[in-house]
A protein has these predicted regions:
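Long, hydrophobic N-terminal alpha-helical segment
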Residues: 1-19
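Short, low-complexity, intrinsically disordered N-terminal segments
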Residues: 14-27, 56-57
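Detector for the mature cores of small, proteolytically processed
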Residues: 39-94
């Protein structure tokens, strides 16, 4: 099961609240081939699409992701934690 930690949800909400996003725009978890940036995943701003899954925090949608990628990341945890490179989101697959 894909899990988003409380720490990650708090940081996603902080990021979302700090942006002036247009109505209907959200933070999206993207993985290859959609994600072409550094690393194995990224968080981008995008509109909600049919079949998306929403992650809520304090009754606010803080993250969306394609329903079909949940099988690819079904045993993973999205977290926000301190790493040797500083505080960042991590996607740990088990």
């Amino acid at each position: 099961m894909f899990t988003v930690t409380e720490e990650a949800k708090q940081e996603l909400k902080r990021i979302y609240d700090s942006r002036s996003l247009d109505v209907g725009m959200y933070l999206r978890l993207a993985i290859p081939p959609v994600w072409t940036g550094y690393g194995d995943f990224g968080i981008v701003i995008d509109s909600e699409q049919e079949g998306d899954i929403s992650v809520l925090f304090q009754d606010q949608k803080v993250l969306i992701l394609e329903g079909r990628i949940t099988t690819q990341i079904s045993n993973s945890v999205l977290d926000f934690k301190e790493t040797p490179d500083g505080n960042r989101f991590t996607l740990d697959v088990f």
